[in-house]
């Protein structure tokens, strides 16, 4: 069915209040967008990331009388009569089909493919990870996930143990197992991530070699040949003492979720215990790798 979209611009501080106003006026869903496409930095746990200038977009049923909606919104103290807004009729589409059509198998490095379940596998002889795009966790489309997958593809993982610190969907741990790792361990603070990783591991036939833990449950003496952490610069710095002890002597470390402008401070947090490689950049993001001294 067709929809009507109403967009208004405000400050990040007022976005939540105007979101409530749109819902009270009849919106069936709300979306926040950055007006200026500013890079996203770390939110605090549980925080909704908003920007200095934020577009608040309400979606309304096509039968909605938008004059009535505008009249209701004009009564809000943050808006007032004649407030700036844009109303747009959205054409009727098969939105689910259009969303699915945007996702294709993606190749990382020489061997590894990430494939949505509804697409044909491009190369049956390649290392294929079946993973459907989702809203919350990594699927390979973000530059940081791509950087980590390419790094794993270039390693000899046969018989190795790999820790995926901040596992999300489990994409990195599962890729490592498909690339030959004997065992992978996924750690995440979010129980939903643990469940997503478990489901994806079962889909890819590697659940018997994947251990998953919330931080409070992880074994104390846990070690691995390879440790990868695709989280964010702030946590990477703060958790450096914890992450640094996970690789065995001579083990490998891969870090991402870091903007290029943040790379130096993250490198500084690990330089004492690791011999670091040159930083690799992709679309303003970077990957930091090294070997345990």
From Swiss-Prot:
Entry's localization field: Cytoplasm
Annotated positions binding S-adenosyl-L-methionine: 145, 166, 188, 230
UniProt-listed InterPro entries: Ribosomal_L11_MeTrfase_PrmA, Ribosomal_PrmA_MeTrfase, SAM-dependent_MTases_sf
Reactions it catalyzes: L-lysyl-[protein] + 3 S-adenosyl-L-methionine = N(6),N(6),N(6)-trimethyl-L-lysyl-[protein] + 3 S-adenosyl-L-homocysteine + 3 H(+)
Entry keyword set: Cytoplasm, Methyltransferase, S-adenosyl-L-methionine, Transferase
UniProt xrefs under SUPFAM superfamilies: S-adenosyl-L-methionine-dependent methyltransferases (SSF53335)
GO molecular function: protein-lysine N-methyltransferase activity
Record EC number: 2.1.1.-
Record-level GO cellular component terms: cytosol
GO aspect biological process, one term: methylation
Classification via PANTHER family: ELECTRON TRANSFER FLAVOPROTEIN BETA SUBUNIT LYSINE METHYLTRANSFERASE
Function: Methylates ribosomal protein L11.
Family: Belongs to the methyltransferase superfamily. PrmA family.
Protein name in the entry: Ribosomal protein L11 methyltransferase
Higher taxonomy: Bacteria, Pseudomonadati, Pseudomonadota, Gammaproteobacteria, Enterobacterales
Gene: prmA
């Amino acid at each position: 069915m067709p929809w009507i979209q109403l967009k208004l611009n405000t400050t990040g501080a007022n976005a939540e209040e105007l979101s409530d106003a749109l819902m009270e006026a009849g919106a069936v869903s709300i979306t926040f967008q950055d007006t200026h496409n500013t890079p996203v930095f770390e939110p605090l746990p549980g925080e909704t990331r908003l920007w200095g200038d934020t577009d608040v977009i309400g979606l309304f049923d096509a039968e909605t009388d938008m004059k009535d909606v505008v009249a209701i919104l004009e009564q809000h103290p943050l808006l007032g009569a004649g407030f700036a807004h844009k109303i747009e009729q959205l054409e009727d589409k098969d939105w689910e089909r259009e969303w699915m059509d945007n996702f294709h198998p993606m190749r990382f490095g020489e061997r590894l493919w990430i494939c949505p379940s509804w697409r044909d596998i491009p190369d049956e002889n390649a290392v294929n990870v079946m993973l459907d795009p989702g809203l919350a966790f990594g699927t390979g489309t973000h530059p940081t996930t791509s950087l980590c997958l390419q790094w794993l593809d270039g390693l000899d993982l046969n018989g190795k143990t790999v820790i995926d610190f901040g596992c999300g969907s489990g994409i990195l741990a599962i890729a490592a197992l498909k690339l030959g790792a004997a065992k992978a361990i996924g750690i995440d603070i979010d129980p939903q991530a643990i469940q997503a990783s478990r489901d994806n591991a079962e889909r890819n036939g590697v659940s018997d070699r994947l251990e998953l833990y919330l931080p409070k449950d992880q074994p104390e003496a846990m070690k691995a040949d390879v440790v990868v952490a695709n989280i964010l610069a702030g946590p990477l710095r703060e958790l450096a003492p914890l992450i640094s002890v996970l690789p065995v002597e001579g083990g490998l470390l891969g870090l991402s979720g870091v903007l290029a402008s943040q790379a130096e401070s993250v490198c500084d947090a690990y330089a004492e215990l690791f011999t670091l490689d040159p930083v690799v950049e992709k679309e303003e993001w970077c990957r930091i790798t090294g070997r345990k001294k």
